[in-house]
Amino acid sequence: MLSAEDIHGQTTAATAVVRMAEIEGRGRALVASKALRAGEVVLRDSPILLYSAIPLKPSSPSPSLSPSHRHQHRDYCSNCFRILEHSSPSVVSCPSCSCTAAAAAVLGGGGGGEAGEYLFCGPNCRSAALASSHTPWVCQALSRLRDYCPSSLPLLHHHQERQLQARFLVAAYNLAIVSPSNFRILLCLQGKSPAQPDDAALFLHALIFSLCPPPAPHGSAEYDFSFSLELTAALLAKDKLNAFGLMEPLAKDGERSVRAYGIYPNASFFNHDCLPNACRFDYVDASATATASECNTDLVVRVIHDIPQGREICLSYFPVNLNHSDRQRRLREDYGFICTCDRCKVEANWLDDEGDEEEEEEEEEEAMDEDHDQLMEDSTEDGGVNEENNFPHAYFFLRYMCNRKNCWGTLAPLPPSNGIPSSVMECNVCGDMKNDDAP
């Protein structure tokens, strides 16, 4: 089995400006191999696996549904996940799915790539998918899991997260068939399966293997694993800790939802910090060109300010505006750890001093809503923050958080040109640009 270093060394997305290191109390991390300038690209990573974030059977959003699972009324290419323009004559469907779309609609499936046929932005994407991510087995499995086979109905009565887990497992098992080497990389990523498979693994493994057991590849010397309950549980653990969401365009009301999830083998090694020094960008809807059409799902990580050699490079796993209690809850539930970064230490002291979490949240919200001019007054002339400021992250939010209403994205300069830093800041959520007039 490949080691983490093998993964980092073999993936073509790896760059010479970061290296793997062991940091006490944090485990494996990516650190700067040299001094980095603001806006410098430290990683460009391609996914080894992508799957749709749209449930097999979409339902009307409910207040209890996570905002990231509430989807706008858009369709996406089932290969590159660009927005589909149905008026375009190049849009094509999967030849197998389109044969069953009418039957699926009768059973309540519908169409448009959500629960009926799978659509592609053109013949090239369809050909690529049919040979990789949307093989005949995937097509059959998704159709049966969706609603074409009556015995799959129990899945459709489960919450939408379970349906997305089913999508992931189909994609992961297919990866084992079409690319055993990439499947090995997936298995090497962080995420330990529980000693005993949980309810999700038990249910999904039994369901998938009763409806559409994956075929074993023939004549592959690389194939040395078997599809088992233990493997299903291990895969779900990898997905939980390593999947990155490719976001839909920011809605007018500020809703942030995911169009697809991807496993990025190098980007998975970035640790979290609540005041990150880097942020990731994706350009899924970038115009397709002869050279870029296959790279639109890449992740690009840029540092947001100068970083000295040897410093760990961290991302925030969620929008930086979340308050202390929400951040700790998400990190504990989704990633299994408690954050002790500098920001969390300060805000934990607020909580201890006040003795009331509600007061802490209220104080944060008030600070977040302060006028930018007032925040700047709290900063020192050299760009630092006044030591007596009760909100020591004010400068970070002022300079590196997008001020577009309901966006909460992180700003990073465009890459330097000929060694000269850019004064243009780009938001990694809404894509807005602004001139950096901070000192």
Language model regions located:
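Catalytic cores of histone-lysine modification enzymes
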Residues: L156-N296, E333-D334, T340-R343
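C-terminal SET catalytic tail plus cysteine-rich post-SET Zn-binding segment of SAM-dependent SET-domain
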Residues: S52-N174, C274-P439
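N-terminal alpha-helical interaction blocks
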Residues: M1-S52
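Short hydrophobic-aromatic micro-motifs
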Residues: A32, V42-L43, F120-C121, F270-N271, ...
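A general structural signal for short secondary-structure junctions and capping/turn motifs
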Residues: A32-A35, R259-G262, I304-I307, L331-E333
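A short, polar/charged loop/turn motif at coil->beta-strand junctions and beta-hairpin connectors
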Residues: T11-A14, H71, Y264, F396
